[in-house]
Structure formats: C-alpha cells, structure tokens
UniProtKB/Swiss-Prot annotation:
Similarity comment text for this entry: Belongs to the ERGIC family.
Keyword Ubl conjugation attached: no
Principal cellular location given in the protein's record: endoplasmic reticulum
Biological source species: Dictyostelium discoideum (Social amoeba)
Gene: ergic3
Bilayer disposition of the protein: Multi-pass membrane protein
Name used for this protein in its record: Probable endoplasmic reticulum-Golgi intermediate compartment protein 3
Lineage, uppermost ranks: Eukaryota, Amoebozoa, Evosea, Eumycetozoa, Dictyostelia
Amino acid sequence: MLISQLKKFDAYPKTVDDFRVKTYTGAIVSIIGGVFILWLFFSQVTLYFSTDIHHELFVDTTRGEKLKINMDITFHHLPCAYLSLDAMDVSGEHQFDVAHNIFKKRLSPTGQPIIEAPPIREEEINKKESVKDNNDVVGCGSCYGAEDPSKGIGCCNTCEEVRVAYSKKGWGLDPSGIPQCIREGFTKNLVEQNGEGCQVYGFILVNKVAGNFHFAPGKSFQQHHMHVHDLQPFKDGSFNVSHTINRLSFGNDFPGIKNPLDDVTKTEMVGVGMFQYFVKVVPTIYEGLNGNRIATNQYSVTEHYRLLAKKGEEPSGLPGLFFMYDLSPIMMKVSERGKSFASFLTNVCAIIGGVFTVFGIFDSFIYYSTKNLQKKIDLGKTF
C-alpha cells in the first residue's frame, strides 16, 4: 500500500514506448546537443583547474625593512673603468661606488664579452686597486699635498689612497701625474678600455624609503654636503650613455610579475645627456595556492631625457643613468584562488540540464512545425 502511494511522488513519469516517435531531425538535434554538452563540460574542467587572481589593497604598516634592487644593465659605449654606482636616500644614507654584490663584465664594441673568465666582482676590483704593488712601496708614500693627520690621512701608497685623500680635500685627481696610479696602470686601463661597453649586474640593499641610485662616470665623493663625481681622468668628456636595461626589479619575482623596464633600450644620438627614470614602487605580497607568501614589490615608471651638451661641448651636468624611486603607502596583496568542487559540479549539472531542455524545446518546435506544415499540404491536395 505504501509503495503504491510512493508512485505519486515520481517527478519523471514514463511514457509507453509505443507512443514515442523518433525522427531524423530529433537525432541530428540530439547529436548537436551532445557535442555542445561535451564542449561546455571540457570548458568547465579547464576552468576548474585554472586559478583566479584576486587583488586587495591596504595600508603598508611594515617598518625597518630593506629594499632589494636587482639590476642587469648593459652600457654599449661606456667602459667598466669609467662607471661608478652610487645610492642615496632621504634618510641621509649614502653608498659611494657600490661594490658589494655588484659585477662588471667588459664588452667589445659589438657587445660580445671580451674575456671568457668569470666576471670580476666590483669589490675585488677596488680591493685589488688598494693593495696592488703594496709590497713594492717602501716607507710612506706622498699624498701630494692632501695629507691630513686629523683625518688619518698621512701616507698614500696606492692610487686609491691618493684618490680618497684628494676627495677629502674636494680636489679632482689627474691620475696621469700620480706615480702610484701610473705604477698600477690606472691611466693605461682607461686607454685600453676606451670604446668598450660594460654589463653591470647584481643587487644592492637600500633603506625602504625614497631615494635614488645612479650610474655615472668617475669616482664619487661628498663635498660640502654635495654629491660630486671626479671627471678629471676623463679629459675628452665624451660619454655615451646608451644602454639596455635587461632587468630591473625591486624584490623577488613571483608568477605573472611584469617589470616595465625589462628589455628597454635607449640610444643617445645627438650628444651627452642624462637619462632619468622616476619609479613608483608598490609593496606587494603574493600568496600562492599552497599558502606560500612572497613579500616583494611591483613598480610603475615614467622617464625623462635631459640633453647636457651637444657633441664636442662641455657637459653642463653629470651624464649618466639615474633611477629616482619612491614607495607607495598602499600595499597590494595578490592571491591565487582555486575553484571549489561543489561549484564545478553545480555548473556541470546546469550545463547538462540547460542544454538538454533548450535543445528539447528546439526539437519539439521543429517536429510540430513540420507536422502542421505537412497537414496543410495534405489538406491542399484534398481540395
């Protein structure tokens, strides 16, 4: 009795097979509907295994962290012996002639590496310049008027020590007239590398505040609270700052990151100038599907070129490549999110039911339209 009453709840009543009519158009519509269902199903499978990227913005509350700046820049017409990398920020911290974690590779005028040996670490170059032929020097070498016992400058046995003593006095150094520099081959290196290019790569660590770093010819020092580059050794004054930024990033990379300055090439044609890039750094946290978090940065950039002198003229400023960066107070969180299986199952059921219903209506429309048309044709033949 209970089982017979249960039949009343059947939402899918069945018809007798004898009352079912199968047609060619119905078969075609069914095949098309099946193909459509399969296409939508595989689309949902692809979508299920893909990830969505969500962005959130909030105030950056981090303090006291360091900012890592990764760089790989090729100077097509500036020798490695000419280049100096300096960094400074609004907190007053200065890094002169940065050498730690910076490498330089000499390039031929055609852009090919000149030597096959491993690239020379910049701090090793400076160390080598400081101690080269030190054993050959007896006693206390002259600083040529730049001695200052109050600052601990009494003897200058190397070219680097003479340069430091001169920079303390605010004097320019002509290495061609300094025996220490002649002995170490400083001027000879400048002459030998003339016409070459240089690839500079590595990274620097700076305070997480606004600042700038730049590549410019000559050794740098501070005089009367001003940042100065000694261009005395480069008497011709012809500095071509044409360059290619192979890579420039602030922090670690994450999937999908786009650095707007990567593979950017600038060519100097009319004279000596200053390339300036104004960078807005946005602190970013990337969170993957596995929960791993990467604290890094993204950035946007605007650029400006300032012509300092036409060819053959004296530059009215310091030629070079300058990056002025500022940090946004807003932090961005980039999160990967996957699809839930329940959502996938719901979409698949909706696809199958929806396509089956729509194509069923379409098949019924074709069947009854054809049947009515056939009746009218038969009725016309009768009369």
